[in-house]
Amino acid sequence: MSIDNKNVVYQQLLRLGYGVRVGQLQAGEVDFVCMKRKKQVYVQVCYLIATEETEEREFGVLRRIADNHPKYVIFLSPLVKRDNIEGIIHLGMREFLLKGF
């Protein structure tokens, strides 16, 4: 995963009005923990989820967060469309940049 790709997501989150920080949680590290008014959102960014190992790395930390705030995995590969997993929303980069959450 290129740092530049995470920067694109970071800049878009700021543009959408979120306060953004890296999440060091008991569950592990989340790419971004975002706050806007009283809304909190967790975001992981990845290129492609092609293996179970990658899926566990990207979704696992979000699964271990024991609250009801929205959780997103933003992926960069334009060829992949996946269903939501355990309430975690799988969102393409293009869709995120055009529509946000």
Regions found by a protein language model. Give the residues of each.
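A cross-kingdom feature that marks ATP-driven nucleic-acid transaction machinery
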Residues: M1-F101
